[in-house]
From Swiss-Prot:
Function of the protein: This is one of the proteins that bind and probably mediate the attachment of the 5S RNA into the large ribosomal subunit, where it forms part of the central protuberance. In the 70S ribosome it contacts protein S13 of the 30S subunit (bridge B1b), connecting the 2 subunits; this bridge is implicated in subunit movement. Contacts the P site tRNA; the 5S rRNA and some of its associated proteins might help stabilize positioning of ribosome-bound tRNAs.
Gene source species: Polynucleobacter asymbioticus (strain DSM 18221 / CIP 109841 / QLW-P1DMWA-1)
Pfam families: Ribosomal_L5 (PF00281), Ribosomal_L5_C (PF00673)
Sample GO molecular function, one term: tRNA binding
Protein name from the UniProt record: Large ribosomal subunit protein uL5
Subunit note: Part of the 50S ribosomal subunit; part of the 5S rRNA/L5/L18/L25 subcomplex. Contacts the 5S rRNA and the P site tRNA. Forms a bridge to the 30S subunit in the 70S ribosome.
Lineage: Bacteria, Pseudomonadati, Pseudomonadota, Betaproteobacteria, Burkholderiales
Domain of life: Bacteria
PROSITE patterns named among the record's database cross-references: RIBOSOMAL_L5
Recorded family membership: Belongs to the universal ribosomal protein uL5 family.
Amino acid sequence: MSTRFQEHYQEKVVADLITKFGYKSVMEVPRITKVTLNMGLGDAVNDKKIIENAVGDLTKVAGQKPVVTKAKKAIAGFKIRQGYPIGAMVTLRGQRMYEFLDRFVTVALPRVRDFRGISGKAFDGRGNYNIGVKEQIIFPEIEYDKIDALRGLNISITTTAKTDEEAKALLAAFKFPFRN
């Protein structure tokens, strides 16, 4: 069973992008390969409970358990030793990825305070898109009363697009609300 976004991609987006960019094969059409959610937790050095709460939040948002990222090397200025847990990360692919993107675009983004659209300039030059979320409470799975602190997260959308223009057209076809 495919999700709403998967069906939309196969039925409408592929045809639109072929006419817009003149691809010769269906396999040339850019597609989203993975979505990575990353939460950096610098304040977890002092309190170990922060990691548990962040992992719980990411699990609710993503629908799968994140991996705890550890410090690669010691940095005395930040009071970090090698191997310290300093973040949490989860990679979504396939059906879970499309379900997350659907919830993100239709439910979470409109709940952002003073939302005027997302920047169209956050592409990396190779067709991938990054967006930072300041508060995890924009996701409906997170209950406002049960959180201990407001935490932001970075969402990286990796595509097979060769250029930023192709990637922007792909994400715009998925109803991403770009402001420029």
